[in-house]
Design a protein with these regions (language model features):
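Hydrophobic h-region of N-terminal signal peptides that target proteins for export
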Residues: 12-21
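Carbohydrate-active catalytic/glycan-binding domains of CAZyme proteins
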Residues: 20-313
Length: 313
């Protein structure tokens, strides 16, 4: 039997080839080299308030559900819709044509933690037959915090009596990601650094938030192959906000800045394109986002798409 020995040069070549292959795989993560293609017209705006922000979308069976922040009279400049602060929802048979359904999460009663406004609903997570929807809330005496509501049908929601469950400074824009039996709740913290806490059951969360070293608001996290990709919003939601992309191969390792997310900006989003959600729809990623072109007087929901690379088919 012959024994072959690898020279140092050959070993170096193999190592470099492996590194190159890994980097090529990482590059295929959405938002790194691929460009999102946004439709030229919005797909939705609340018919009652002419205002829709922070969309979160889930498909169950043949129905799509969109939850969003509606009517925020506190918005700087006096804009913010026509009604009372709340989280509304709409449904769709195809993810494109939406029908308004009503209020999902109303503003809290006087003295409650969300009596000023509920906002930024996270995508509902199903556990043991119950959907959990985390969202941010605020009253006049406290900074933004995070609580949740539950539902069995995605239509009628009951607020958790122990809200808020996360209240360590500024806690906004929750996003929940499940990986290997652990729930990661990503959220914006004071200074706009994106951090996360973990939970085994969606109820009890780790006491000390972990920094991702990514900066922004309204974070979204998806796993594409072996790469975790985070999208974070940079700027102000009514004046020039955009998405920045970050990646990591391990959630225990800080995310690396991948540059500005590549997406065409339609006319209705010339002022700001941000705070959205991504779903996997057959062979495409669908990216729902909030958009404005008039300084925040009106927010609408847009949709961008991107074909999935062979890596994740």
């Amino acid at each position: 039997m012959k024994i072959y020995y690898l020279t140092p040069l050959i070993r170096l070549s193999i190592a470099l080839a492996s590194i190159f292959q890994d980097s090529r795989a990482a590059e295929k993560a959405p938002g790194i080299t691929d460009t999102w293609k946004a439709a030229e017209s919005p797909v939705y705006c609340d018919p009652e308030d002419d205002w829709a922000k922070d969309p979160s979308v889930i498909k169950v069976g043949n129905t799509y559900y969109m939850y969003y922040t509606s009517a925020n009279p506190w918005q700087e400049g006096g804009s913010g819709g026509k009604g009372e602060s709340r989280i509304d929802y709409a449904t769709s048979p195809d993810g494109l044509k939406w029908t308004y359904q009503g209020v999902a999460i109303p503003k809290g009663k006087p003295g409650e933690w969300d009596d000023e406004r509920p906002q930024a609903p996270a995508k509902p997570i199903l556990k043991n037959g119950v959907y959990y929807m985390y969202y941010a809330g605020k009253n006049a005496k406290s900074p933004v915090a995070i609580g949740y509501a539950t539902s069995t049908d995605l239509r009628k929601w009951t607020k958790h009596l122990g809200n808020p469950v996360l209240n360590h400074g500024k806690c906004n824009d929750p996003f929940i990601f499940l990986e290997n039996g652990t729930y990661y709740l990503f959220h914006t913290s004071g200074g706009d650094v994106i951090r996360y806490v973990t939970s085994p059951d969606l109820l009890t969360w780790s006491a000390t938030p972990v920094s991702t070293e990514a900066v922004g608001e309204g974070s979204i996290v998806i796993k594409h192959g072996s790469t975790y990709t985070m999208f974070g919003c940079i700027g102000f939601s009514n004046n020039g906000e955009y998405y920045q992309t970050y990646t990591t191969q391990d959630l225990a390792i800080p995310f690396t800045d991948g540059g500005k997310t590549k997406i065409n900006i339609p006319e209705f989003a010339k002022g700001s394109l941000c705070h959205g959600d991504i779903i996997q729809n057959e062979k495409d990623y669908w990216f729902y986002f909030q958009a404005t072109r008039d300084g925040g007087q009106k927010f609408q929901i847009g949709l961008a798409k991107q074909s999935m690379s062979p890596l994740s088919k």
